[in-house]
Structures are given as C-alpha cells and as structure tokens.
Amino acid sequence: MRTKRRTPGRRGWRWVVWALVGVLVSAAGIAGVVVWQNTYALREETVSLRHDGKVLKGVLARPETGGGPFGLVVFVHGDGPVDATHETFYRPLWESFARAGYASLSFDKPGTGGSEGDWLDQSMADRADETLAAVAWARGRPDIDGRRIGLWGASQAGWVLPKVAARDRRLQFVIAVSPAVNWLRQGRYNLLAELRRDGATAQERQAALRRRQTTLDLLERGASFAEYRAEVGDVDGMTPARWSFIAENYRSDATADLCAMRGTPVLLVLAGHDINVDVAETEAVYREILPARSLTVAHYPAAAHSLVDHDLERSRWRLTLTAIVAPRKLYTGRFLAEQASFVQRLDTGEEVRRPDTGDGAARPDTGTGADRPGTCKGTVRPGTCKGTS
C-alpha cells in the first residue's frame, strides 16, 4: 500500500522561516554587539620612528574629536614580544586616556610586528633610550602638547620608567603598573609564589631553589648558554637569546633611578593577587624613596599582575569570551576610570594624591617618604639611595 508523503503546510513553512529569521537576527545582534564593544572612540595612526639605526613601527591613538594639541601617554611594555596594541589589550586604556584629553603612543617591540631589531638584544638602558627617543619624536608634533607627556608602563617596565624619568625632568607623570624593584628578589619571589600556587612539596621547593642558585652562579661567572644547558639539563624553554637577555639584565635594580626621578608625580598601581611581583616590597621602596606629595598608591585587591580580575584570569573560557564580547571588562574594578582621573587631576592642578572612590582605593602616601631635598633614606633595603637631592 502506498502512503502519501506529508509535506509541511503553509503554516509549517511559515514557522520554519520565522525560526530561521530569529536565528539570523540573533546572530546578527551578537555580531553587532561584538563589533560595537571592539570599536573605540579613537583615531589611530600608524607611525614610525628611526632609532639606533632601526625603524620602529607604532600607533598614535588620538581622541576621536578635537585638533589638539593633546597630552600624551607613552607606553612602555613589560616582558616578551609585545606589539603596539598588546594584541588589542591596550585599547581600552587608550580610550580612557582619550576621554581625559590625552593621546597614547605605543611602538612594536624590536623584532615584533613591523619593528626592526630584536628585543632580546636590549638592556634596560637600551629600552630607556628607545623611550626617550619616542618622547622626543612626540614633542616635535604640532598635535602633541610637549608639556603634557607622561609614561605608562607595566611589570618589567618598572626598570625602564625611572631611568627615563630621571633623564627627562620635563615629563608630567609616570604610571607604574605592577613594577618590581630588584630583578633577583623579584625572581625569587615569583618562583616561590608559583610553587605555593601549584602545591609544591618541601622537597620540590628545595630542588627549585637549588636550581635557581645554580643558574645564578652560572650568570655570575658569565657562562654561555651551552654551559647552562650542560649544567641544568632540562632548560625549561630557555633559549640562547633569552639566556643572553637575562645575563644582560639580571642585576637590574630601580632604586638609584627612583632616587634620581624624585619629584615627578607617580601613580603606583598594585594588584592584590600578584604572584609575579612582591607588591609589599615595591610599595615600601617607593614610599621610602619618593616624596609623599608626588606619590599616589592605588591598590586593586581583586586583580592579578595584569590588572585583570584574578577570578577571571583563572578561567580560560571566561577570559576569552570577555576579551571578545566585552574587552573593557577585562580590567579590574575602576582601574580604567582611575587611570584617566589621575591625569585629569594633573591637568587641572588638583591635588594628585586625593583618594579616589571605587575598587581602586587610590590613596595618598602617608609614610615618611623623602619629602625634603637631600633625604632619601636607606632603611628599606641595603643600597637605597642616601643624600640624594
């Protein structure tokens, strides 16, 4: 017996069509939200700078409206092969500064993006020279107010920012995000913090410290990468270029340069869940050396080293989704708003140490930091500057 195939009636087809329309509209809506959330109130211009015989490529991000001259925030990267936008991570910051009337300038690290050279060939002094060249280049532009140029830097930039500010006393400010003071102490702190996080046993901890000491002994005697590899066996991702970079920079300490830059307004940004940097030591040294009247310290208790919320950073899928759908929400609490308010207060001549409200809890330095010329006391760490005017 033959059966008649049933086909959807007009109402059935109509339901299918409307269901498809709904799916398409939803998809278009989501796509629209993603596009909107990744669109910033900025005018970005690709720029280039010749420095030390090499061309550096970068981005100048100006406020969306106005002809300037604008203030300028020059970005100084942390460790690694960072491009000008830090894979777009900087753009929310640029937008916040733009709302305060400041442009942002950032270059691809040498050997990254469009820049020539190799960042692993650089010392911290080389990085400071590069930053000074960027500042000088910016002062030559009619759309930039040369009196309103400051620095923003994170992590490893903590050894670069003070060098630059010590040599260019015209800088309006320095914003130091999660900086360390001493390379060796920072390395030990980071190692032990990661071992605690990973639940290492006492034996594993001692083995890691022995390996670290072996590495330091090799660095002290100027050993080659081949000698390092022969001594430790598993190089754990170390490359010859990275070994050379560490050998060049492992003695870095910001203390003397912090003394030399005293008087420049500084915003010190510290995270509550930082396992890379000993924020207690950093804060103590900054408060000891820098005048109270020029230092603002902002604590973000929920943040990790990157100023992303610690809980968000621990969830890869949430972190990825947030980066795509709501990139401004990557940063903790009121971090973005308080970056902008710091430079705005400098522009208006308002007291820069006034506490902010919100999660950042920026507050003035109330310690006994060196307020008077000639007093840069050495009570925090051996070697802290003394008698620096």
Report residues per predicted region.
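Short beta-strand element of the alpha/beta-hydrolase
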Residues: P69-G78
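N-terminal cap/lid segment of alpha/beta-hydrolase-fold proteins
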Residues: V33-G68
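Accessory cap/linker subdomain of secreted extracellular hydrolases
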Residues: I175-A260
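Short alpha-helix in the alpha/beta-hydrolase fold that links the catalytic acid
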Residues: V277-E288
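Conserved alpha/beta-hydrolase
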Residues: W94-G114
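The serine-hydrolase catalytic nucleophile loop
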Residues: V82-L93, K109, A280
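Short beta-strand/loop motif that positions the catalytic acidic residue
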Residues: M261, L268-L270
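Alpha/beta-hydrolase active-site loop
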Residues: D121-P142
